[in-house]
Amino acid sequence: NRGPAYGLSAEVKNKLAQKYDPQTERQLRVWIEGATGRRIGDNFXDGLKDGVILMELINKLQPGSVQKVNDPVQNWHKLENIGNFLRAIKHYGVKPHDIFEANDLFENTNHTQVQSTLIALASQAKTKGNNVGLGVKYAEKQQRRFQPEKLREGRNIIGLQMGTNKFASQQGMTAY
């Protein structure tokens, strides 16, 4: 739908295209098709563009995440599906800075960010115990609780980084 890019816009478009990883696309395709049972098609971005497969994916990971899947008859239905998916993955635990914008997928402007979001979703799924073959398991917060007496004792200890105070004196010091 967009015309040709010139100047800085063309440079940005080329830089984004260079960051796109076909190997990651294959891994994402295997994961999504395995989880949903639906074939994406030859063109990865076009297969996800209507948002239906994405909503099925999040509903498999967390049932009931998206209540209504719009039949993608018109463009606004497709955009609404993508928007519902993005809201659902945010509630699932994907960080807002990892989430693509609906137009990145719908207008084919930033496929790299779409890949990054799907990898972040796979990582979150792995963290929640799903058997996912890509992404990393996020670390869990380990809360430590110390007794007040132990905390007071720690204030009186001179740390090894501070060295020793055994030979401390003011000998050789002069006033300004």
Swiss-Prot record:
Q: Which domain of life is it from?
A: Eukaryota
- Tissue spec: Smooth muscle, and tissues containing significant amounts of smooth muscle.
Name one cellular component (GO) term.
focal adhesion
In this UniProt entry, the residues modified to Phosphoserine are S169
Q: Which InterPro entries match?
A: Calponin-like, Calponin/LIMCH1, Calponin_repeat, CH_dom, CH_dom_sf, SM22_calponin
- Where the record annotates domain Calponin-homology (CH), the positions are 22-125
Keyword vocabulary terms for this entry: Actin-binding, Calmodulin-binding, Phosphoprotein, Repeat
Q: Name one GO biological process term.
A: actin filament organization
Where in this protein does the record say Phosphothreonine is found? T164, T174
Question: What PROSITE patterns does the annotation carry?
Answer: CALPONIN_2, CH
The family assignment reads: Belongs to the calponin family.
Q: What is the stated purpose of this protein?
A: Thin filament-associated protein that is implicated in the regulation and modulation of smooth muscle contraction. It is capable of binding to actin, calmodulin and tropomyosin. The interaction of calponin with actin inhibits the actomyosin Mg-ATPase activity.
PANTHER family registered for this protein in UniProt: CALPONIN, CALPONIN-1
Protein name as it appears in the record: Calponin-1
Q: Which organism is it from?
A: Meleagris gallopavo
